[in-house]
């Protein structure tokens, strides 16, 4: 066995099984699973470089497998079943020297039970003494079939021996993970009390040496849901994860996990071989065509600037795309626009975008928060007094933004209706009329229907504002826009302060993507500005971020019962077509999936009996 690699200047911690004892490992994984917008991710790899990269990328645990090592040598994963080397010696050689000293997440040792000459207890003692606190049955007999599988099982070297190994590992206080493929295997593993059960959907597709599969994503999800239901009926505490088959991208992983109610995903080829092949091809091609590539970069940067300028709203999520389409139509009309959304979602920026899109010559954007209406309409002087001009008279062609519209008194709301309907207004204190030829934009932090039902808006005004209503979703409902928003804010910061170009590191993104953002994009900008001051290099990392609280406790949420009915109504309206329902609700499809899981809503309409 090779001596552990020790890099100069890197401290190698002393690892032993008690440091990653069974209870500690499972508690760590459950804590990670409890964070918002989080799915457990395991990386099944075979080199120290891959393990460190996966750990930096946020992997919750590592599987050290002979298949991972073979992939790094250019062979497909299926070669792991061939008797090329003594598998446990092979894995121990690289995992102890390259992986254990340099990652802080739990490492599951891929242990083979095929060799009848090896005592299970002796192998486990050797693995535990090397510092491993967790074990997984790999290579495994579940990939065998037909007569060969029957012969292996008949010789007592198949899946039952693997379960015996996992049970023995638990007695040594080691965490256990079982590979399964069938309902029967899953039930046996659950009965054995295995901590994590990984449903393997077949060898991975994708890349140059990927396998083929006839299994669709939906079929994979439905099969996994059946398996996981069986597991949880036996052992509700068992963590259920999946791997392989048709899943080759994060989006596909999320779709299958959401539909099947999986706790997580294990990536093997999808984490090392497939992206490595693609990235090496791309970087080699980039070196060969650097001039052409730079032109493409310049073009993409121009496109990014265009996206950022478009109506002053940054993002490409479905809800934001829908808002942009709606704004394009509203900007070309004379309808009053009513913008609602939580504080900090960018209502004033959106108002400016609508104003600029309308291209009214000589027009300014003027804002008002006057509850009495005096600054809007002006008022006639009393005897000996002085006449006061209102904004409508002083800026007759401006775009007028009325913030916190619900604070307007009833008289001011009635006068506003007259402006909307006729373009005429009356000053307070007399009946003298003036003409307003500009644009009205109104804003509130409360939903429009709520403003009407609570009596804060008179019904006539609510009905006039409904056709031009635009709802800005909170940042927590469009987290897919966060990277683009971060780039936008850092680019603006660079221009304002003439500072260097900054980018957000993956470690910082992991923190940002799991935060609830109660103050929305306003808070994101503040966080990035603080991080930019703390950062001395070119990359903002997690340690540069200011402390972020638990937004999920503070952020306003609708009553669960009301929100459930609201979502169910949208699904029924659109015959459970989730993409259309999400667009109707103004949230992302991912957010809709999450909320459906939380409220136990069916993924398709129930058949009537």
Swiss-Prot record:
The entry's DNA-binding region: 578-597
Organism: Sinorhizobium fredii (strain NBRC 101917 / NGR234)
CDD domains attached to this UniProt entry: AAA
Any one biological process term the GO annotation gives: regulation of DNA-templated transcription
Xref: Gene3D superfamilies: 1.10.8.60, Aldolase class I, Homeodomain-like, P-loop containing nucleotide triphosphate hydrolases
Name this polypeptide is given: Putative transcriptional regulatory protein y4pA
GO molecular function, a single term: ATP hydrolysis activity
Residues given in the record as ATP binding sites: 395-404
InterPro entries: AAA+_ATPase, Aldolase_TIM, Homeodomain-like_sf, HTH_Fis, P-loop_NTPase, Pyrv/PenolPyrv_kinase-like_dom, Sigma_54_int, TIM-br_IGPS-like
Annotated keywords: ATP-binding, DNA-binding, Nucleotide-binding, Plasmid, Transcription, Transcription regulation, Two-component regulatory system
Cited Pfam families: HTH_8 (PF02954), PEP_hydrolase (PF09370), Sigma54_activat (PF00158)
Sigma-54 factor interaction domain span: 313-533
Entry function: Probable transcriptional regulator that acts in conjunction with sigma-54.
């Amino acid at each position: 066995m090779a001596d552990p690699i020790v890099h100069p200047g890197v401290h190698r911690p002393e690892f032993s099984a008690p440091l990653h004892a069974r209870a500690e490992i499972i508690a760590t994984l459950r804590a990670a699973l409890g964070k918002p917008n989080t799915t457990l991710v395991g990386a099944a790899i075979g080199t120290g470089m891959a393990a460190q990269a996966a750990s930096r990328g946020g992997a919750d645990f590592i599987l050290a497998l002979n298949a991972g090592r073979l992939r790094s040598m250019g062979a497909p994963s299926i070669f792991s079943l061939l008797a090329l080397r003594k598998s446990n010696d092979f894995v121990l050689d690289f995992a102890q020297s390259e992986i254990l000293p340099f990652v802080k997440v739990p490492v599951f040792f891929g242990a083979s039970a095929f060799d009848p000459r090896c005592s299970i207890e002796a192998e486990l003692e050797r693995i535990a003494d090397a510092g491993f606190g967790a074990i997984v049955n790999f290579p495994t007999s579940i990939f065998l079939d037909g007569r060969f599988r029957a012969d292996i099982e008949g010789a007592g070297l198949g899946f039952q021996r693997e379960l015996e190994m996992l049970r023995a590992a638990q007695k040594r206080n080691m965490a256990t993970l079982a590979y399964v493929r069938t309902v029967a295997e899953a039930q046996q593993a659950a009965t054995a009390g295995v901590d994590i059960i990984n449903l393997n959907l077949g060898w991975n597709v994708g890349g140059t040496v990927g396998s083929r599969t006839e299994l669709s994503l939906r079929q994979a999800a439905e099969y996994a849901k059946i398996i996981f239901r069986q597991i949880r009926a036996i052992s509700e505490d068992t963590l259920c994860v999946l791997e392989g088959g048709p899943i080759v991208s994060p989006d596909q992983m999320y779709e299958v996990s959401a539909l099947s109610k999986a706790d997580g995903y294990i990536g093997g080829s999808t984490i090392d071989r497939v992206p490595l092949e693609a990235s090496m091809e791309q970087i080699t091609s980039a070196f060969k065509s650097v001039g052409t590539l730079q032109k493409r970069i310049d073009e993409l940067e121009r496109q990014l600037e265009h996206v950022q300028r478009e109506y002053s709203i940054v993002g490409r999520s479905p809800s934001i795309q829908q808002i942009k389409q709606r704004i394009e139509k509203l900007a070309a009309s004379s309808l009053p626009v009513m913008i609602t959304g939580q504080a900090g979602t960018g209502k004033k920026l959106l108002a400016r975008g609508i104003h600029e899109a309308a291209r009214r010559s000589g027009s300014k954007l003027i804002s008002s928060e006057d509850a009495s209406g005096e600054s809007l309409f002006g008022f006639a002087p009393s005897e000996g007094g002085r006449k006061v001009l209102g904004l409508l008279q002083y800026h007759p062609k401006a775009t007028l933004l009325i913030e916190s519209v619900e604070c307007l008194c009833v008289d001011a709301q009635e006068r506003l209706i007259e402006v909307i309907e006729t373009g005429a207004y009356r000053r307070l204190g007399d009946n003298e009329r003036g003409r307003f030829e500009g644009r009205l934009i109104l804003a509130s932090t409360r939903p429009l229907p709520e403003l009407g039902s609570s009596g804060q808006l008179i019904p006539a005004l609510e009905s006039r504002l409904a056709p031009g209503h635009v709802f800005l979703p909170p940042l927590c409902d469009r987290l897919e826009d966060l990277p683009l928003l971060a780039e936008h804010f850092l680019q603006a910061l660079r221009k304002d302060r003439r500072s260097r170009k900054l980018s957000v590191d993956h470690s910082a993104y992991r923190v940002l993507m799991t935060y609830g953002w109660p103050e929305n994009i306003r808070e994101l900008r503040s966080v990035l500005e603080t991080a930019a001051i703390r950062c001395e290099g070119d990359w903002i990392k997690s340690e540069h971020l200011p402390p972020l609280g638990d937004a999920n406790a503070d952020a306003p949420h609708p009553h669960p019962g009301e929100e459930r009915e609201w979502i169910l109504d949208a699904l029924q309206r659109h015959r459970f077509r989730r993409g259309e329902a999400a667009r109707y609700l103004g949230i992302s499809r991912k957010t809709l999936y999450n909320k459906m899981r939380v409220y136990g809503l069916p993924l398709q309409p129930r058949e009537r009996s």
